[in-house]
Amino acid sequence: MGFMGEITRALISVSDKRGVVEFARRLQDFGVEILSTGGTAKALMADGVAVQEVGDYTGFPELLEGRLKTLHPKIHGGLLAKRDDSSHTRQMAEYGIPAIDLLCVNLYPFAETIASADCTLEEAMENIDIGGPTMLRAAAKNWEGVTVLVDPDDYAAVLQEMEQSYGGVGASTRFRLATKVFAHTARYDGAIANYLSSLGPDGNRTTFPQTLSLQFKKAQDLRYGENPHQAAAFYRDGSGGGLADAHQLQGKELSYNNIGDGDAAVALVMEFAEPACCVVKHGNPCGVAVGPDLLGAYQRAWAGDPISAFGGIVACNRPLDAQTAELISDQFIEMVLAPAILPDARPILAKRKNLRVLAFDDGRAWRRTGWDYKRVRGGLLVQNFDQAMEAETDWKVVSERAPTVQEARDLAFVWRVGKYVRSNAIVYGREGQTVGIGAGQMSRVDAARCGVAKALELGFDLHGAALASDAFFPFRDGIDAAAAAGVKAIIQPGGSIRDEEVIASANEHGIAMVFTGVRHFRHG
């Protein structure tokens, strides 16, 4: 049988054929006998790899259009048998079952199949792998005697270890690979369960499945959570994109709060087509601005509230240039994020060794997909992400006076920002810059007053400014407070039982008011 971990026979059957030919060829160089199935066998033989097909090995042909290939005692006995158990080895000899020391399998692309909008139930069912998961689980259960691979990215490490250990693979590697297999098959079965339980009586998919299986992979441990006494870690969901795939170029390790604030900051600036910057602190934007270039946008975003911005998170939706980097390096910032950091900006930022600098390859692809989750005691709240953003053509002018062209631009700007401010949220802005933000207040009029107070504290003149409210005004008092500060245009969802009273207040003050019909609450 050979010592534990020694590989003399391997079974390879993969749908993802990346690197499999070279992997099999290298195994053969170690004297490993290769068993294979169907398309994998053809691919290997076409490249000169000597292969014994599973049907010839078991003496049993593939049946049922390939549905039955590897479900055979000679396969599963070779994977499950304990190499150091005399009763197992005796039965293997009695029934002619050689040991299979390495299994390389990945599964039918079920998740990719159901991702297609026109996928039928029949197509989905045909892409449920049966033999693959069965072999993987058998091999992983018997990790002490079998090396099992489910990910092409592990081929190189296994080959390197075989080179260093005369054709064997160590116990710690086998255990790690087996653990990876069970995570993989759990995710695979979870996707199947989610899909099937989302089908309604008519066979069409409902929005939410009756049962929900989730799996995340740990990206890193964090020093602590929201507070130092809380333990924390960061997990990936495998969907790609976002901070999970951003590249940290320098600085201290990311904290729990860095990740949360960074996600909010990038999502905000990616709402804008023109160059945009924002500074986020404790989940709320302090200042946001757009402009013809990144430098101007950053200068105006910082000026939106330089006191609150101290120690904040900066996000940009354009590659970070040297001029903007110079400004950032002169201010106390925890982290800066951009689609790329231009070469001449890097040495400037490097002077601030603790400054966390992250680049994400394609900023325009920063669009939240899937579902948004919120843990509550005893359960999980699930909803679609708030991807809505109402265009000017969707607005309804409800005041006697329609907004001017410039006021409409300002309204569109503050409306986008308001979506990312915690409720109750009021945003004041002018010419692509926030000049006062009232966030997280229990009453809307208090949010309006907070925004005015912040603007006055910073020396901004609100005469002619635009205001956005994330939800309707329940009373006219918020309109009156805004008018007293000089606001001349307001955008809000509408829908209050006192809308007529609110509109009357706008008309009394000569304010242009539009309704969007869509609320954008954000509760953190």
UniProtKB/Swiss-Prot annotation:
Gene Ontology molecular function: any one: IMP cyclohydrolase activity
Domain MGS-like residue range list: 1-150
Pathway note: Purine metabolism; IMP biosynthesis via de novo pathway; 5-formamido-1-(5-phospho-D-ribosyl)imidazole-4-carboxamide from 5-amino-1-(5-phospho-D-ribosyl)imidazole-4-carboxamide (10-formyl THF route): step 1/1; Purine metabolism; IMP biosynthesis via de novo pathway; IMP from 5-formamido-1-(5-phospho-D-ribosyl)imidazole-4-carboxamide: step 1/1
UniProt-listed PROSITE patterns: MGS
The enzyme's E.C. designation: 2.1.2.3, 3.5.4.10
Swiss-Prot/TrEMBL keywords: Hydrolase, Multifunctional enzyme, Purine biosynthesis, Transferase
GO cellular component, one term: cytosol
InterPro entries referenced in this protein's UniProt entry, alphabetically: AICAR_Tfase_dup_dom_sf (IPR024051), Cytidine_deaminase-like (IPR016193), MGS-like_dom (IPR011607), MGS-like_dom_sf (IPR036914), PurH-like (IPR002695)
One Pfam assignment: AICARFT_IMPCHas
Gene Ontology biological-process annotations: 'de novo' IMP biosynthetic process
Superkingdom, natural source: Bacteria
CDD domains: IMPCH (cd01421)
Catalytic activity: (6R)-10-formyltetrahydrofolate + 5-amino-1-(5-phospho-beta-D-ribosyl)imidazole-4-carboxamide = 5-formamido-1-(5-phospho-D-ribosyl)imidazole-4-carboxamide + (6S)-5,6,7,8-tetrahydrofolate; IMP + H2O = 5-formamido-1-(5-phospho-D-ribosyl)imidazole-4-carboxamide
Record note on domains: The IMP cyclohydrolase activity resides in the N-terminal region.
Family membership noted in the UniProt record: Belongs to the PurH family.
The protein's name in its UniProt record: Bifunctional purine biosynthesis protein PurH
Annotated source species: Acidithiobacillus ferrooxidans (strain ATCC 23270 / DSM 14882 / CIP 104768 / NCIMB 8455)
Lineage: Bacteria, Pseudomonadati, Pseudomonadota, Acidithiobacillia, Acidithiobacillales
